[in-house]
């Protein structure tokens, strides 16, 4: 039962094919880690590693012991599947290759 000291928060987790958003009423002073545990998402998605998961509140990275405020949305982030630097490097190389051979050969 909700009391006047309860706050409303959301916990979100997304896979490419499925997204979950759980709305909760939690006591004031609840941490992001506590809200994730209360959401049931760790049971629903056994692939989430509670010890190493990266989390944020509205796209801003936070620590698991961050105390939540009214209407916060805790987001559980999946691990990256590609190194961002390697992806940028590959795109830059592909762009250079396209620019080198850009003519049709008819101009001197």
Curated annotation (Swiss-Prot):
Pfam families reported for this sequence: Ub-RnfH (PF03658)
InterPro entries listed in its UniProt record: Mopterin_synth/thiamin_S_b, RnfH, RnfH_sf
The organism's place on the tree of life at top rank: Bacteria
Family of this protein: Belongs to the UPF0125 (RnfH) family.
Record-linked NCBIfam families: PRK01777.1 (NF002490)
Protein name in UniProt: Protein RnfH
Lineage, opening ranks: Bacteria, Pseudomonadati, Pseudomonadota, Betaproteobacteria, Neisseriales
